[in-house]
């Protein structure tokens, strides 16, 4: 299927998943939480435990595990790209090493303290061990969803802003990204990050992974940077792939095979030269609602195959009927090899009501909104309530 990259999201609030010898608490404490069920844990206090305490749930890859995985991938012509989250999504680190947070206490912050020089010592030490394990050209540093609230009142962060002549807290994230990029570049690696790394000014050689739609990727390539396209509406496989009532619990949304296949990673707004900077496309599967390896396979296949074909095919050569027929066969072949795929031949498909127009007295009338609607569910914008169109499984 010509899938040639595996991006491993190795750290997040739910647990630290890679052995770092210089910081043993990452695997003795930050890798273990109070409940195996993510939703129960997330809604129930979000606490961590030592690995040897009763009820501890979690785990991690040893460095020997990583070497074995990297070698297996190499034999199958796949490069593994590791991700170490910074500056946000770091609750687990800051519970184990609270001195790296603005508060200096566990369970207070999710973001590293950018004003603390020890933060950079920690991150560089971690990345040094990571680079020794992964030969990938790219090292992914996260960069998404930083809260930044603590930085506004943290004396160390405010001093950093003054010393570096920064005018907004967004620039603190940019400061961190620039420093980490230089460190990676000095070691012969490229920095890759989610599209929030554009905030405050993009690091000189950074590659942007565009997940909040395509805008971040387009901004990157039009300014001469590389981009990887992975917009949530087409590429996040933790959404339902069929009618939600027929599927295991998922994070929400509706992303069927056909929609993944419809994606074009290279925007028609780009020039030929800019298009060359779109280096690829990627599907993502976050596993908060995916508790077993079998469930992972179910969510991945066959939708991953659709993105693989999209990434390697010129848009004019794509044919949904042809791909769908081949996907049915691919599912049969994968199941024969022991994979637990989605049963494509039994797909329910779009919500029937979404294909039936609705007639009512307000059809086409202007709607006045007293409060803004949630942009995540914008649908058809101001005319959504009066356009006569019913929603699909997403909304």
Regions found by a protein language model. Give the residues of each.
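Disordered, acidic Ser/Thr/Pro-rich linker "stalks" and the adjacent N-terminal cap
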Residues: 354-395
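Surface-exposed, flexible loop/turn segments at secondary-structure boundaries
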Residues: 14-16, 88, 147, 199, ...
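Generic domain-boundary/flexible-linker signal
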Residues: 17-19, 91, 150-152, 202, ...
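Residues that line or immediately flank small-molecule/substrate-binding pockets and catalytic motifs
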Residues: 10, 285, 371
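Residues that flank catalytic or metal-binding motifs in active/ligand-binding sites
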Residues: 22, 108, 204, 277, ...
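Short, low-complexity intrinsically disordered segments
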Residues: 14, 30, 36-40, 149, ...
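Substrate-binding groove of N-acetylhexosamine-processing glycoside hydrolases
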Residues: 68, 77, 120-138, 145, ...
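Substrate-binding cleft of carbohydrate-active enzyme catalytic domains
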Residues: 1-189
């Amino acid at each position: 299927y010509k899938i040639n990259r595996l991006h491993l999201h190795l750290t997040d609030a739910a647990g630290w998943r890679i052995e770092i010898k210089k910081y043993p608490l990452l695997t003795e404490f930050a890798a273990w939480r109070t409940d195996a069920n993510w939703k129960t844990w997330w809604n129930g206090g979000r606490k961590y435990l030592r690995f040897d305490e009763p009820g501890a749930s979690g785990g991690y890859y040893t460095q020997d595990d990583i070497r074995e995985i990297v070698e297996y991938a190499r034999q199958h012509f796949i490069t593994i790209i590791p991700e170490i989250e910074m500056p946000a999504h770091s609750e687990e680190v800051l519970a184990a090493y609270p001195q790296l947070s603005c508060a200096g206490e566990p369970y207070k912050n999710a973001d590293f303290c950018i004003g603390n020089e020890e933060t950079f010592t920690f991150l560089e030490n971690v990345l040094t061990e990571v680079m020794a394990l992964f030969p990938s050209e790219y090292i992914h540093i996260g960069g998404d969803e930083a809260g930044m609230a603590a930085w506004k009142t943290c004396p160390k962060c405010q001093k950093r802003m003054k010393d570096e002549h920064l005018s907004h807290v967004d620039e603190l994230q940019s400061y961190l990204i620039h420093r980490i990029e230089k460190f990676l570049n000095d070691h012969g690696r490229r920095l890759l990050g989610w599209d929030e790394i554009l905030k405050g000014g993009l690091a000189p050689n950074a590659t942007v992974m565009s997940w909040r739609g395509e805008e971040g990727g387009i901004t990157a390539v039009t300014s001469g940077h590389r981009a990887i396209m992975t917009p949530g509406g087409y590429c996040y496989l933790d959404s339902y792939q069929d009618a939600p009532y027929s599927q295991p619990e998922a994070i929400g949304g509706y992303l069927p095979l056909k929609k993944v296949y419809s994606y074009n990673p290279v925007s028609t707004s780009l020039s030929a030269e800019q298009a060359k900077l779109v280096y690829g496309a990627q599907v993502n599967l976050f596993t908060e609602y995916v508790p077993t390896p079998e469930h992972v396979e179910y969510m991945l296949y066959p939708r991953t195959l659709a993105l693989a074909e999209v990434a390697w095919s010129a848009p004019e050569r794509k044919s949904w009927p042809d791909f769908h027929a081949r996907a049915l066969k691919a599912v049969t072949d994968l199941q024969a090899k022991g994979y637990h795929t989605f049963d494509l031949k039994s797909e329910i498909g779009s919500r029937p009501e979404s294909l039936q127009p609705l007639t009512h007295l307000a059809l086409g009338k202007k709607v006045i909104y007293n409060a803004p609607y949630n942009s995540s569910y914008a649908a058809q914008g101001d005319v959504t309530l009066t356009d006569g169109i019913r929603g699909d499984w997403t909304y």
